[in-house]
Regions:
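N-terminal adaptor-interaction module of cullin-RING ubiquitin ligase components
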Residues: 1-147, 152-205, 217-222, 229, ...
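C-terminal capping region of solenoid repeat domains
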Residues: 2-20, 25-28, 192-209, 215-223, ...
Length: 526
């Protein structure tokens, strides 16, 4: 019928699209790399905004980008398998400015040995931070090499390693600038005598976590005269004597964290000698009572952060909180878990602690509508509030619609008497308020048990500033298996409850097992 063969229509040009001929890849003669106008520092600053995967891809664009990326990377996270030894020379030639290094290995795999550790320390002489996790084939010889070659080391963290006290002593004797030491689940800890020399003169922070013989490091804790932060978490043995000696010889502590320990009021009274104390965490210490807390409150009047998990032993209550309300007028952060305060103590804190900005009430059967209404009326500076597992109803939450003028965030979880309608009404009244509401069923008691990875900090409320950091990972570290076999679980239970053996607890120490308001103690404002 006179029809011509069909042909592909020419594409309609996009008149709104502006092309720059100089950047078009087909115009080779006119091609200009505009990144050449950027200095290396500027290019490196751009790389800092990229994710780890994107930064890896960018390093393959050209030789200059590869060089800039290698010279400006200060953090490396490596999978510490034995095969890493073959790649260490070339890897650390490329990344010759590394100051922060993490070596991680799965607990079921063999790790790098002393030869690899010494070689790494020779190539990274400017290291300021070193983290070893699961490196079970490194002995005290490898750690001695770290001490000999990394004289600028300031922060050392070791978890699930086998070199024990000898390996730590080898580093401490050689790195006189070490300021921060963290030891978690360290094997081979028996006795140590010379740890207090050398690094004790510069150590400012010590963290001992889940050590079977953690008291082997008591001389180090006592001998560190510049110590500012002390964290002892889940370590076996009686710690009263160590704290008494710390209070006598090292009263400059600013932060003290005591968690899942065999410590009594004797230890708290010793801590009270640190008059400049700023932060105190007393978490699941079954034998601490109002007596020790009152002593700390009366002497440490600069306290700003207090976390108390009474483990529902009913030994910390109104008396201790009234002492805090009376003496700690600068209090900014208060977390109460598993204790039984009444209206009088909470009202005193709300009235006297005018700078209180963060408050968490978790698993407290004595906190109801009246207490929340009092907080809403008197806590003028309050910015963040967490209520979890408390008998509070819509009436109590409704008071937040007009109270606490500076309140920006509220978290409500596992409060059976609070309904979605009550929460929506508060949201309508205060549109700018971030309201996090969870009406899920109440969990079993202590649902946040440590699995050896998350650790004891899962049971506390942490208020941490948001920090944007690009963590560099050249070789992706395998995720450590979170599940453990029956033997590991039995060992963990023994380490947790073994300190209760032979101790005279009050009759109500285990009343929490029969309470109907069981609630997990984990909470967060995140």
């Amino acid at each position: 019928m006179g029809q011509s063969p069909s042909t592909t229509a020419a594409p309609t040009p996009d008149l709104n699209r502006h092309q720059i001929p100089q950047l078009h890849p087909n115009t080779d003669s006119d091609f200009t790399d505009y990144t050449l106008r950027l200095s290396d520092d500027c290019l490196a600053a751009i790389f800092d905004f990229l994710s780890t995967a994107d930064r890896k891809r960018c390093s393959l664009v050209c030789r200059r980008w590869l060089r800039v990326d290698g010279q400006r990377r200060h953090r490396l996270s490596l999978n510490a398998l034995p095969e890493l030894l073959d790649f260490v020379p070339s890897l650390l030639i490329r990344f010759d400015s590394v100051t922060k290094l993490a070596l991680r290995c799965d607990r079921k795999c063999a790790s790098i040995n002393d030869d690899a550790m010494v070689l790494i320390s020779l190539r990274c002489r400017n290291l300021t931070r070193l983290k070893l996790r699961g490196c079970r084939d490194i002995t005290e010889l490898g750690m001695a090499g770290v001490g000999d070659n990394c004289k600028a080391l300031k922060k050392l963290s070791c978890a699930s390693c086998m070199f024990g006290a000898k390996g730590i002593a080898a580093v401490l004797d050689r790195c006189v600038t070490l300021e921060d030491l963290t030891l978690k689940r360290l094997r081979g800890v028996h006795h140590i005598t010379d740890v207090e020399v050398g690094a004790a003169a510069s150590l400012k922070s010590i963290c001992l976590k889940e050590l079977v013989n953690g008291q082997s490091f008591a001389p180090l804790v006592i001998g560190s005269k510049k110590l500012r932060t002390l964290k002892i978490i889940g370590c076996t043995g009686d710690w009263d004597e160590t704290l008494v000696r710390v209070g006598c010889f090292n009263n400059g502590l600013v932060e003290v964290y005591l968690e899942k320990l065999q410590v009594t009021d004797v230890g708290l009274v010793a801590v009270s000698k640190c008059f400049g104390l700023d932060t105190l965490h007393v978490v699941k210490t079954a034998e601490c009572s109002d007596v020790g807390l009152c002593a700390v409150a009366e002497r440490c009047r600069f306290l700003r952060k207090v976390h108390i998990d009474g483990w529902r032993t009913n030994r910390i209550g109104d008396d201790g909180l009234l002492a805090i309300a009376k003496h700690c007028l600068n209090l900014q952060e208060l977390v109460l878990i598993g204790v039984y305060p009444t209206f009088s103590s909470l009202a005193a804190i709300a009235s006297n602690c005018r700078n209180l900005e963060r408050l968490a009430l978790c698993g407290i059967g004595t906190v109801g509508d009246a207490e929340i209404e009092c907080i809403a009326d008197k806590c003028v500076a309050l910015r963040k509030l967490c209520i979890k597992g408390c008998p509070v109803s819509n009436a109590g939450i409704g008071a937040l619609a007009s109270g606490c003028p500076n309140l920006v965030k509220v978290k409500v979880k596992k409060c059976k008497r609070i309904t979605g309608k009550g929460v929506e009404w508060v949201r309508e009244q205060r549109v700018s308020l971030a309201f996090n509401y969870d009406d899920s069923e109440v969990e079993a008691l202590d649902g946040s048990a440590s699995d050896g990875v998350g650790g004891a900090q899962d049971n506390t409320v942490e208020f941490l500033p948001t920090i944007n950091q690009t963590t560099v990972a050249v070789a992706e570290a395998d995720a450590e298996a979170s599940s453990s076999n029956n033997n590991n679980r039995l060992t963990m239970l023994r380490s947790r409850f073994g300190f209760l053996a032979g101790r005279n607890l009050v009759p109500g120490a285990f009343r929490r097992w029969s309470n109907g308001d069981n609630v997990s103690s984990s909470s967060s404002f995140g």
